[in-house]
Amino acid sequence: MLSAQLEAYLAEINLSATAEQKKQLIDFVGMLNKWNKAYNLTSVRDPEAMLVRHIMDSLVVSKHLQGERFIDVGTGPGLPGIPLAIMNPNKTFVLLDSLGKRIRFQKQVAFELGIRNISSVESRVEAYQAEQQFDGVLSRAFASIQDMLSWCHHLPAENGLFYALKGQLNDEELQQMPSGFVIKEIIELKVPKLDEQRHLLKIIKE
């Protein structure tokens, strides 16, 4: 059932996946559902809803990624980082979260599903110092763009981008961008079976 739904959703967003990638995505939902009962990783309880709200909500960003090295800040159980890593095996993803149970889950997912292009790090973002900066800094965890830019300003490489995943846009928030940062592009995202606004903001350092 989930496999057929995934197939239809991928076609809807015009994203092609191998049989192995589809299996990994479905197995990720299975692991999330199983671990969630004990670890409380997400408020979404139903696998079909997870497929929409977690997998597809992450994958609509995939075709907009530029570069090879990414960090997903406040990734929780690995969202959007794990679905994006599955679909982009030639890119690398650091998954950053401050809660140990989430990091343990991510590492188990990587081990069981054979995902080799992610590394999970338990750290607060402001304390994290990368050996090499990133082409893209992703997050759907921050309440405000200002918080994201303030805490993650040290992470992108010289021409790196911030990818802020937002629901409904707040005009006031957009007008109060911190100095030194510019919104390069605002992309309206369409998530299959999700009747809610979704936006991707690409932000650069001036």
From Swiss-Prot:
- The keyword Ligase appears for this protein: no
Indicate whether Methyltransferase appears among the record's keywords: yes
Signal peptide residues on this chain, from the entry's feature table: none
Top-level taxon in the UniProt lineage: Bacteria
Q: What is its EC number?
A: 2.1.1.170
Q: Name one GO cellular component term.
A: cytosol
Sorted alphabetically, the keyword list is: Cytoplasm, Methyltransferase, rRNA processing, S-adenosyl-L-methionine, Transferase
Which molecular function term from Gene Ontology is one that the record holds? rRNA (guanine-N7-)-methyltransferase activity
**SUPFAM superfamilies attached to this UniProt entry:** S-adenosyl-L-methionine-dependent methyltransferases
Q: Which CDD domains match?
A: AdoMet_MTases
Q: Where in the cell is it found?
A: Cytoplasm
Binding sites annotated in the UniProt record for S-adenosyl-L-methionine? G74, L79, V125, E126, R140
- Pfam families, per the entry: GidB (PF02527)
The reactions it catalyses are: guanosine(527) in 16S rRNA + S-adenosyl-L-methionine = N(7)-methylguanosine(527) in 16S rRNA + S-adenosyl-L-homocysteine
What does the function comment of this entry state? Answer: Specifically methylates the N7 position of guanine in position 527 of 16S rRNA.
Q: Which NCBIfam families match?
A: rsmG_gidB
The family annotation for this protein states: Belongs to the methyltransferase superfamily. RNA methyltransferase RsmG family.
Q: How is this protein named in the record? A: Ribosomal RNA small subunit methyltransferase G
Q: Which organism is it from?
A: Shewanella sp. (strain W3-18-1)
> Coding gene?
rsmG
